[in-house]
Structures are given as C-alpha cells and as structure tokens.
C-alpha cells in the first residue's frame, strides 16, 4: 500500500512538472516573438477571379502584459502587382504547448505554426492554414521597449502605410470587395 502511494505521488509530481515546464517555455517563446518580423510567408490573396502573391509580410506581435503567452498585433501582406498595396489585419495570437496560434480578427480565419525555429533574429519553419503546410522565413526588425534608454533615446517605429489613389472616380463610400487570403505552396 505504501509503495502504491509513493508511485501515485511520483506520477502526480511528474505530471505537474511537465505542465509547469511547458508553460514557462510558452512564456519564453512569447517573449522572443514580441516585436516586428519581416519576410516571406508565402501568402496569396484571391480577388475578382485572380490570385495575387504577396511580395513580403510584416507581422507585429504585441505581448499582453497580463497574460504570459498571448497577445495581439498586426499582420500586413504587401503586394506589388495587385490592385492594392497591402492587406492588413489585426491578429490575436497565443502560444500553447509550443504551438503558435494566430487568429485574423477581420477575416475570422486562423493559422497554426507548430514546427519552427525561433531566436532573437530569425523565425522560420512551417505554417498551416488547415489545408496547406508551407515553409516561411522572417527576420526580426524591431522590438518595443527592449534596451530602452528611459528618456535618453526614443523607440521609433517605422510603421507607416500608404496606398494608391483610386483614380477611377470611385468615392470613399463605395463598398469594395475584400480579397480572400490563403497560404500558397512554394
């Protein structure tokens, strides 16, 4: 009986340690992920019967100060041969047992990143939208508040947008069809 008690107690301690170690790892992943990343996510948008490939993508992950491994941010795909310059979305993201889940607020769609390598400078691996599993590569361009000099130097974000003018006589009240984003194969 005593041996059975110790075996059950040992199993409970191991299970607790496993859960607590993975939550610390999730927090570290979220901390490293925070900031702006730029590169190729192999994203395309379908619009008006045509498919357009994004030239590059910028993703800003902002960590929630009250949650250890989640936050929100922005995902912007830039295009050079499309009727628009970029497609931007607000995102909600979380890290759960090492897997990064990204939810596009305006589109109501999700992506999952589970097989990846992440350090302070580079983020690469595989992204899955539920139907396609595609390789991606991003480089870290900025991080808010790290190495901040508290009054001696400002953190400046080079985040800005501009778009082509409509030029076709359409007014700002014209309802425009949104492009549909999807992950494309290489």
Where are these regions (language model features)?
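Bacterial N-terminal signal peptides that target proteins for export
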Residues: 1-10
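Generic short beta-strand segments
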Residues: 38-45, 70-78, 128-130
